[in-house]
């Protein structure tokens, strides 16, 4: 099971009393702000949750799994996520509870 943007919108509708259109717009706006910050090369810090950062990966050798031929994997920029201590603790507590 996965949490979707629609699930988040539904939760805002139920918990905060926003209408469904407002809830959907709020979720979309949040993710658009995160996307735009990352596009500008900025780090995104969500207190109590974690950090999204950009990392440059160098070109490296790879292999075509079908042919075994060696091919270069081009340099690229990737988004990484590092969970914060509070999130780590909550996940560990949940996993430790046997649920």
UniProtKB/Swiss-Prot annotation:
Keywords: DNA recombination, DNA-binding, Transcription, Transcription regulation, Translation regulation. InterPro entries: Hist_DNA-bd, Histone-like_DNA-bd_CS, IHF-like_DNA-bd_dom_sf, IHF_alpha. The keyword Isomerase does not apply. Gene3D superfamilies: IHF-like DNA-binding proteins. CDD domains: IHF_A. It comes from the Bacteria. One of its GO terms (molecular function) is DNA binding. One of its GO terms (biological process) is regulation of DNA-templated transcription. GO terms for cellular component: cytosol. Coiled coil: none annotated. Belongs to the bacterial histone-like protein family. HAMAP family: IHF_alpha (MF_00380). Heterodimer of an alpha and a beta chain. This protein is one of the two subunits of integration host factor, a specific DNA-binding protein that functions in genetic recombination as well as in transcriptional and translational control. This is Integration host factor subunit alpha. The lineage of its organism: Bacteria, Pseudomonadati, Pseudomonadota, Gammaproteobacteria, Chromatiales.
């Amino acid at each position: 099971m996965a949490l979707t943007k629609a699930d988040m919108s539904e939760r805002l509708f139920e918990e905060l009393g926003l209408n469904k259109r407002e809830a959907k717009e709020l979720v979309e706006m949040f993710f658009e702000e995160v996307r735009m910050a990352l596009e500008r090369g900025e780090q995104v810090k969500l207190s109590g949750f974690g950090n999204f950062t950009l990392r440059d990966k160098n070109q490296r050798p790879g292999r075509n799994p079908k042919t075994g031929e060696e091919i270069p994997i081009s340099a690229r920029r990737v988004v990484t996520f590092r969970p914060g201590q509070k999130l780590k603790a909550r996940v560990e507590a949940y996993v430790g509870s046997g649920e």
